[in-house]
Every structure is written in C-alpha cells, then in structure tokens.
C-alpha cells in the first residue's frame, strides 16, 4: 500500500476514499495519547484498504484494516476503536451513543443526546426534548438540519462558543467519562484510538 501511494497522487472524495488500481484506499485519523503538559494527544492520518458497503461486517473489516495499517508503523501499540463497530466491549461502551451520565433523578443521558440537545441555531434550539430520545433519534432529528446556522451550545444554564472547534463536545465527553470510573480506568490501557465513522472532512 505504501509503495502504491508513493507513485500515485490520490484524489480523495468527501468520504476520504480513493482507488489505486483495484484497491480502494481510505484515510482516517488515529488519536494517539500523549500524557503530559499541554495537549494530551496528537492526531495522525492513516491510509488503509477500505471495504465498501453498509453491512456491519464491512465496517468491522474497515476497523481491522485501519488498526493493522497503524500498527504496521507503530508496533506494540494498543489501539481501541470507540464506536458500536468495535470488536471490544470497552470500545462499544465508550461510544458517544452509549456512554451516559445519570442525573439526580436517576435518568441516564448519553453524550450524543447531551450534545445534540445543547445546540442553538439561528432559528431555533436548544431542543431539550432530544435528551429523552435514543442517541440515533437525537442525531437524526430533522430540526438539527432545518433551524439555520449553528450559533452556540447551552448546557446547565451556561453558554459555550463554537470555537475552539470540538471544545464543547470534548468537554461533555470528558465530564461524562469521569463519572464512569471503571471505563475511565480501563481506557488507560490503550495507546491510540479510532472511530471508523468519523470523517474530519
């Protein structure tokens, strides 16, 4: 794969995939933990063979392909896919669709529902009823696409700006994770993390 990439200029589509001969190649980020002062991680983009299709098994093949490509250059590192397509139960539990925090009334809210229900648009929001939907329903709610430009986020009577990018999402995720002590400890066993569905484009 690396030799092909040296000789062929890749023209990536919106899904960050390209074709080299008969091989479909994708590019996805790998987030590498770097504990210490300042930014605690770095991001690298990795090229890997892509398996097209909507079936779950195809996504799982893509995850394995991405991890194999990464470990080929970073031997000995433990990589965890954080999504419902993870082969490890920890990765599934850490997905934003599943990782949840419990309020004082005993109700669980997932990271995804908190994030989507906090969006303020030019023409509406925040839609707090999304807290009580499934994560999938919250993400696909039509109002998130028909309420104009995203302006900010609101949570617990506090406003959050759009910049720095991903700040609010990261803040929600980290604050939810620390409330799940077992998961927060288990994640420390890994060196790098992926989300096969995440496309930075």
What kind of region is each of these model predictions?
Residues 2-84:
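Short, extreme N-terminal leader segments that mark the start of a protein/domain
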Residues 73-74, 146-151, 182-188:
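Short amphipathic alpha-helical segments, especially helix-boundary/capping motifs
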Residues 79, 86-93:
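Compact, well-ordered interaction domains used in eukaryotic information-processing assemblies
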Residues 85, 158, 193-196:
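Residues at structural and domain junctions
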Residues 91-95, 99-179:
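A contiguous catalytic/ligand-binding core that recognizes phosphate-bearing ligands
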Residues 123, 142-144, 188-196:
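Charged, low-complexity intrinsically disordered segments
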Residues 171-193:
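A short mid-domain helix/strand-loop element embedded in enzyme catalytic domains
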Residues 198-200:
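Active-site nucleophilic cysteine motif
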């Amino acid at each position: 794969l690396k030799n092909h990439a040296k000789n062929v200029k890749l023209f990536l589509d919106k899904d960050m995939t390209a074709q080299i001969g008969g091989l479909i190649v994708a590019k996805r980020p790998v987030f590498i933990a770097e504990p210490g002062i300042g930014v605690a991680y770095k991001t690298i983009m990795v090229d890997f063979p892509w398996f097209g299709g909507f079936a779950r098994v195809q996504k799982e093949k893509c995850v394995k392909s991405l991890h194999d490509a990464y470990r080929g250059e970073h031997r000995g590192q433990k990589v965890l896919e954080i999504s419902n397509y993870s082969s490890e139960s920890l990765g599934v539990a850490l997905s934003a669709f599943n990782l949840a925090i419990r309020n004082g009334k005993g109700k669980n809210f997932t990271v995804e529902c908190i994030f989507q229900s906090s969006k303020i648009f030019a023409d509406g929001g925040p839609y707090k009823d999304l807290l009580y939907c499934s994560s999938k329903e919250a993400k696909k709610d039509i109002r998130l696409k028909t309420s104009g430009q995203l302006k900010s986020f609101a949570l617990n009577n506090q406003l959050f700006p759009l910049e720095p990018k991903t700040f609010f999402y990261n803040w929600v995720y980290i604050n939810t994770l620390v409330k799940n002590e077992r998961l927060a400890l288990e994640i420390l066993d890994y060196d790098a993390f992926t989300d096969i569905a995440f496309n930075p484009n």
